[in-house]
Regions:
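General marker for long, soluble alpha-helical cores
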Residues: 16-330
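Sec-dependent N-terminal signal peptides
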Residues: 4-13
Length: 330
């Protein structure tokens, strides 16, 4: 069970992190080289956003790709009318705390292409150095800028007792949208995770203050849940409404580990309701899991009743399945 949960955690984390490819840490000291930008197939609906990609390197060597939605208002000098019109030269700048990208090229017919130069912000680098984090390389500063990392993130981490982050840690937090506001939200919900990796994991799985609060409101056993419990809830789809359903069905003391096991093995409120209708009320959660593991279904129980086997115990049902008994077959 534990190995399975750890494996699922790793698989889910890998899937969630694949959408943005940040530079490999071993490449941090290499020069950026040419930065290419690209806008392709801009949505006809004008929502003030544009999907913009930045790429460095040639082929697979020293290559990094960043693709994200940007507010057009943040791309100083680029307008929707330029993107919608006929092809024309354009210039724009993307300015962030860690540095600025000055870009040129051509745009029109809902697409665009060109190159950029990057200038690290010396003041931002100086603040990181003064905080004991270190001075970012040009490539790291570029990553910090595209990941929207602000210095208030460093301050908020310190305020809530996190280990001092590295520059790479800050990039990872930025990629996954862990802002200063998110750090505070999690802290206000009672979680100071200590390690930046734990905060990234929370963000990957969508754990926020509302989710924590909704769980805590269900009952005392869901207050002060461990960080691992919260992550496993997200991995296996244990939602507040699911837990409330079980508590209303006669399981007010249901615990986090039972919930995860039930989700893994396919126990559902519908399954519990079917069993109750057949005379099996308040079956212990571990027995519910055993029934599902061994393929005891409502149809199996109904078929037994038709053969005159009235209300065997959960243990007897499991033994019948283990013995290979099939109602209607001799």
């Amino acid at each position: 069970m534990t190995k399975f949960v750890l494996l699922m955690t790793a698989v889910a984390a890998t899937a969630c992190t694949a959408s943005t490819a940040a530079p490999n840490r071993s490449d941090d000291n290499r020069p950026l080289g040419t930065i290419r930008w690209n806008i392709d197939n801009l949505d006809r609906r004008d929502d003030g956003q544009v999907q913009l990609s930045f790429r460095t390197g040639e082929g697979s060597r020293n290559n990094s790709n960043w693709s994200s939605g940007y507010d057009l208002a943040d791309l100083q000098g680029l307008s929707r009318s330029q993107l919608d019109g006929s092809n024309q030269p354009v210039r724009f700048a993307l300015v962030r705390e860690a540095g600025r990208l000055d870009c040129s090229g051509s745009a029109g017919n809902r697409q665009g292409v060109g190159t950029c130069g990057f200038t690290p912000d010396a003041g931002f680098a100086g603040r990181l150095t003064a905080a004991g984090i270190g001075r970012p390389t040009e490539r790291q500063a570029y990553s910090l800028a595209l990941a929207k990392v602000r210095y208030d993130l460093v301050e908020e981490l310190g305020r809530h007792g996190y280990d001092k982050p590295t520059v790479s840690d800050l990039v990872g937090l930025g990629i996954h949208g862990a802002t200063a506001g998110y750090v505070k939200e999690i802290a206000d919900a009672g979680y100071r995770l200590g390690k930046v990796d734990g905060l990234v994991q929370f963000r990957i799985f969508g754990i926020n203050g509302r989710f924590i609060g909704d769980m805590a409101a269900i009952g005392p056993q869901f207050r002060n849940l461990s960080a691992d419990d919260l992550v496993q809830f997200k991995i296996f789809g244990v939602k507040p409404e699911l837990v409330r359903a079980y508590t209303q069905m006669g399981y007010p003391a249901i615990n986090p580990k039972d919930l995860v096991a039930m989700q893994i093995h396919g126990v559902s409120p519908e399954f519990v309701t079917e069993l109750a209708a057949l005379g099996y009320r308040n079956v212990p959660t571990q027995k519910l899991v055993e029934l599902r593991i061994h393929g005891v279904t409502a149809d199996f129980i109904r078929d037994l009743k038709q053969e005159g086997v009235a209300l065997p115990s959960p243990d007897q049902l499991v033994r019948l399945r283990l013995a290979g008994y099939h109602p209607g077959k001799r």
